[in-house]
């Protein structure tokens, strides 16, 4: 039998029998909101890079934190849904503006790194998301404690590097942070599924978790690629 004559049912690739229909609908809403967040964040970064109307810094960080707190404090129901989506868009926009210092650093080295980092982040995010969706339910939730310990280690490394100013320690922080955030994609995806199965259908807030995972991976991957490119240029001189 010719292998090329076989009929492949692509629909079966996207059937998750271990996830209820209502949760699958919830996940569609989560990823739709995530897509909107990505678009709005890209707009925020674009406005800065092209027009310089907004400057990324402490104000944008405080603004995004304020928006996130406002979103968390606003109850999820049909009456507040549009309001919460607007707050989510504001949070995503300010987060995009907050990326600008990193973008400026990368553009000064090699602008093409931004596209490479975005594509790389997308591949990483999709692969780890599918792994979490196809895996046995709750199989990655045990990572929660390990990931939180990893964040504590990253914090200690940051504090140490404030005194030592070591490039090697900074690079180790970036690589370890990238690994930890990949783990968060697994854990957060399955945690969202479990919350939805237990009746928590707040897709707006759930999209925030995944959005922060994506943005953090993107930021760290950009810096890693930029530093590697910078080192290669130094070696050529």
UniProtKB/Swiss-Prot annotation:
Sequence ranges on the Cytoplasmic membrane side: 1-29, 74-86, 134-139, 188-206, 228-237
Expressed in which tissues: Highly abundant in testis.
Keywords of this entry: Apoptosis, Calcium, Endoplasmic reticulum, Membrane, Transmembrane, Transmembrane helix, Unfolded protein response
Gene Ontology terms: cellular component: endoplasmic reticulum membrane; mitochondrial membrane
Pfam families found in the cross-reference section: Bax1-I (PF01027)
Intramembrane runs of residues: 207-227
Keyword Endoplasmic reticulum assigned: yes
Residue intervals on the Lumenal side: 51-52, 108-112, 161-166
Annotated GO MF terms: enzyme binding
Location (main, coarse): endoplasmic reticulum
Alphabetized InterPro entries for the sequence: Bax_inhbtr1_CS, Bax_inhibitor_1-related
Transmembrane segments: 30-50, 53-73, 87-107, 113-133, 140-160, 167-187
Topological relation to the membrane, as annotated: Multi-pass membrane protein
Subcellular location(s) per record: Endoplasmic reticulum membrane
GO BP field: apoptotic process; cellular response to unfolded protein; negative regulation of apoptotic signaling pathway; negative regulation of RNA splicing
Domain comment as written in the entry: The intra-membrane loop at the C-terminus acts as a calcium pore, mediating calcium leak from the ER into the cytosol.
Role: Suppressor of apoptosis. Modulates unfolded protein response signaling. Modulate ER calcium homeostasis by acting as a calcium-leak channel.
Membership in a protein family: Belongs to the BI1 family.
UniProt-listed PANTHER family: BAX INHIBITOR 1, BAX INHIBITOR-RELATED
Record-given protein name: Probable Bax inhibitor 1
């Amino acid at each position: 039998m010719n292998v090329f004559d076989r009929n492949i049912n692509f629909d079966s690739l996207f059937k998750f029998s271990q996830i209820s229909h209502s949760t699958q609908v919830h996940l569609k809403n989560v990823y739709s909101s995530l897509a909107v967040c990505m678009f709005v964040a890209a707009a925020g970064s674009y406005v800065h890079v092209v027009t310089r109307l907004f400057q990324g810094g402490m104000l944008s960080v405080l603004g995004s934190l304020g928006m996130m707190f406002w979103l968390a404090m606003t109850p999820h129901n049909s009456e507040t849904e549009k309001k919460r989506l607007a707050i989510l868009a504001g949070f995503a926009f300010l987060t995009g503006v907050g990326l600008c210092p990193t973008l400026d650093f990368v553009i000064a080295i090699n602008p093409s790194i931004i596209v490479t980092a975005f594509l790389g982040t997308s591949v990483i995010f999709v692969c780890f998301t599918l792994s979490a969706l196809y895996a046995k339910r709750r199989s990655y939730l045990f990572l929660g404690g390990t990931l939180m310990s990893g964040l504590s280690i990253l914090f200690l490394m940051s504090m140490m590097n404030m005194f030592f100013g070591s490039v090697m320690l900074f690079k180790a922080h970036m690589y370890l942070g990238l690994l930890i955030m990949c783990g968060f994609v697994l854990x957060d995806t399955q945690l969202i599924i479990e919350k939805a199965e237990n009746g928590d259908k707040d897709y707006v807030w759930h999209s925030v978790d995944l959005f922060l995972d994506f943005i953090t991976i993107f930021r760290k991957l950009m810096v890693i690629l930029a530093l590697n490119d910078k080192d290669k240029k130094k070696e050529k001189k």
